[in-house]
Amino acid sequence: MRKYIKIGVAGPVGAGKTALIERLTREIASKYSVAVITNDIYTQEDAEFLTKNSLLPPERIMGVETGGCPHTAIREDASMNLEAVDEMVARFPEVELIFIESGGDNLSATFSPDLADVTIFVIDVAQGEKIPRKGGPGISRSDLLVINKTDLAPFVGADLSVMERDARRMRNGQPFIFTNLMKNENLDGVIGWIEKYALLKNIEDPASLVR
């Protein structure tokens, strides 16, 4: 019986996918056995960032160079990522959580169900308050939607209440959460969601979770 959970993390370039994983691993690596797989088209930049900035040892971080469309590597042909998962499990048989970060993508990115057990989709306020209502599979069908960079709302003219209203409508009862990862605001809510819905801990919904 498989003992680990694979969490797919997707979202547009610059929304905060790598930052979210870096902050999460800093907080939970002492409690759970964690590994990370990143996807970049031609480089291993995200893997290198995590190696330098997260608390995980380098051998728990693996970069996959997709060499093409980042969507294909997580959906139509996930073989490279599945091989990376197998290698991580071989290295660390006790691993409990494997984060799989997609390459930079748009609102249509989805993970193959063979690759991710649950999915987190990250967007950010800097893209404008209209982003939630644009919809797309990531916004409407991910298991958790993270709306990051709330601190930038006043500078880009974004109304967080409008974003919340639109996210509620597009998500149809699925949870979402507002974060400011620069200050770790509501990071505990993301961790609580992972513990409750990915690791199936018997705990209450985080107070910062919105439905």
UniProtKB/Swiss-Prot annotation:
GO BP annotations, alphabetical order: urea catabolic process
Major place of residence: cytoplasm
Pfam families membership: cobW
InterPro entries, sorted: CobW/HypB/UreG_nucleotide-bd, P-loop_NTPase, UreG
UniProt keywords, alphabetically: Chaperone, Cytoplasm, GTP-binding, Nickel insertion, Nucleotide-binding
Gene Ontology terms for molecular function: GTP binding; GTPase activity; nickel cation binding
Source species, domain of life: Bacteria
Gene Ontology CC terms: cytoplasm
Cellular localization per UniProt: Cytoplasm
Subunit details: Homodimer. UreD, UreF and UreG form a complex that acts as a GTP-hydrolysis-dependent molecular chaperone, activating the urease apoprotein by helping to assemble the nickel containing metallocenter of UreC. The UreE protein probably delivers the nickel.
Function noted in UniProt: Facilitates the functional incorporation of the urease nickel metallocenter. This process requires GTP hydrolysis, probably effectuated by UreG.
Protein name per its UniProtKB record: Urease accessory protein UreG
Organism (species): Actinobacillus pleuropneumoniae (Haemophilus pleuropneumoniae)
